[in-house]
Amino acid sequence: MVGYDPKADDRDISNVEVAVAGSVSGLVTRVLISPLDVIKIRFQLQIERLSRSDPNAKYHGILQAGRQILQEEGPTAFWKGHIPAQLLSIGYGAVQFLSFEALTELVHRASVRDARDFSVHFLCGGLSACVATLAVHPVDVLRTRFAAQGEPRVYKTLRDAVVTMYRTEGPLVFYKGLNPTLIAIFPYAGFQFSIYSSLKRAYEWALPAEGKKNGNFKNLLCGSGAGVISKTLTYPLDLFKKRLQVGGFEQARASFGQVRSYKGLLDCAGQVLREEGAQGCFKGLSPSLLKAALSTGLVFFWYELFCNFFHHMRKADS
């Protein structure tokens, strides 16, 4: 079970083991879903409609975008920014799960509320994600820049990107899009954790015999469902965040179509609604939902798997 549960006997693991489980779950998942992430970011940053009817649109569908990126930039393009993305996943996973476990235990010890309640998991999930975001946001900006650039590349290496961005845009460039990120990540992660635990309980109630078995499949299925629901509810804020993160990067974006500059979150939201309509707030939703289903399902699957592995190792040693 993710989160503190006083009745569970399978969470007698150390903070280091929790951090390792969170890190590895993020690392493995990132390798698998990186191509979808690149396509999603390209969709989010495209001003033109994602439609065949718009002659100026570079991308209009997942398969078409995948083929075009492959033809123009080669297979490695699907792992553009993979090093910063992996640093992001490893650091974020460790901090988020460690914070979540600590916060749910704190709630249990400091109040009479059940640490497994939907509201407790929502609040602790949101707060743990905010802590993790503050820790790794500069890496997220780097990942977005790498995934957004076409050919020829503006940044050749991670070091080149850090030096160039710092020199041309100042230190605050590494926290571009932080406000919408925090605003978006709190409800997104809150829903992820709370819906995941709720779906697991619903699964065990609906299939009591199966609920005790096939734990790995249950974790994967419930994690995927939680990812899809959470992403749908909070998607527009994720799009605004991506648009803000590539501010000052307009020249490298010119080959992809129109570019825009935004003064902040409200200005970004206003421009998107005026120029692209309400549907503009959901550009890239399809690959995002597919990515959310895979990534959230896999993250919870791997996290629970590694936690159980550490638990059984301790049990065998005792």
Curated annotation (Swiss-Prot):
Solcar repeats lie at residues 13-106, 116-202, 214-309. A motif (Substrate recognition) lies at residues 241-246. GO terms for molecular function: antiporter activity; thiamine pyrophosphate transmembrane transporter activity; thiamine transmembrane transporter activity. Belongs to the mitochondrial carrier (TC 2.A.29) family. Mitochondrial transporter mediating uptake of thiamine diphosphate into mitochondria. It is not clear if the antiporter activity is affected by the membrane potential or by the proton electrochemical gradient. The chain crosses the membrane at residues 19-39, 87-107, 122-142, 173-193, 220-240, 293-313. Keywords: Antiport, Membrane, Mitochondrion, Phosphoprotein, Repeat, Transmembrane, Transmembrane helix, Transport. One of its GO terms (biological process) is thiamine pyrophosphate transmembrane transport. GO terms for cellular component: mitochondrial inner membrane; mitochondrion. The modification Phosphoserine is found at residue 51. It catalyses: thiamine phosphate(out) + thiamine diphosphate(in) = thiamine phosphate(in) + thiamine diphosphate(out). It holds the Pfam family Mito_carr. It is a multi-pass membrane protein. SUPFAM superfamilies: Mitochondrial carrier. PROSITE patterns: SOLCAR. It is found in: Mitochondrion membrane. PANTHER family: SOLUTE CARRIER FAMILY 25. This is Mitochondrial thiamine pyrophosphate carrier. Coiled coil: none annotated.
